Amino acid sequence: AQEAIDLVRETIEALYAEKGDTAKLWGSMVKQTLKRRQPSFNESFYGFASFNELLEEAQARGQLELEMDKRSGGYVIRSVTQPS
């Protein structure tokens, strides 16, 4: 699972580098970018039923801060934190 989280973190960091640290990053945008960078990526390979489940695990491990968008039901990435 940590390998998948690392891929997500790298993708988020690349998006922040490209769009700026204040950019609003949606979970779906992160997944699309990750699939472009690694076309073979599939969260189920790492044991996650959905990409949101992967994001939730990253947050549970203290590596991401998420916010649920009430209108869309999707996640917005608030920040990437350094693994402890």
Language-model features, listed with the residues they occupy:
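N-terminal regulatory modules in eukaryotic regulatory proteins
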Residues: 1-84
